[in-house]
Amino acid sequence: MTLRQLIDDHDPESKQPYHAVEFLCVEEATGRLDGYLAVATRLAHDCIRAQSEQLKGRGMAVRSVGIIDSSSRKQVSLPSILASHALIHAADGDHFRNALFVAAEQCRLQVCRIPARRLEAHAGKCLRRPIEQILGTVNKLGLGKGPPWGADQKKAALLAWSLLAL
């Protein structure tokens, strides 16, 4: 494992963007969400650039970014999202994944977006090994690195390893 770092892609007001606009009219909510997305994209871009420079200083080059997508419905209207607490949570996650996608493209990186439910099959195909062996290796990657090393970090490592094989 070369670098493990969170991307700081929000300011305090926009940490949960759809929650922040939950009780606004659709027009005002749309405007605020656009602003929050611009902030998240700029912050993600700055973080990607900083991490890329850090790795460049160690003789490595960043070529791609992997994004694990949720299984949530993508084509839901804003009024429907704001009327459902579950959809608000899904939209919050999609908001930051979309910001990361745009930021990575702005940095001229290849972007691989894959639904979480297809990640293991994708990894098995890319790495040409039994998935049990792959998952065993991923589980060991975080040993001695300190917390967190939970399911999200393991999935991110699995996608990163898969991208290295391409």
For each of these PLM feature ranges, what is it?
Residues 1-166:
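Phosphate- and other anionic-substrate recognition elements at nucleic-acid/protein interfaces
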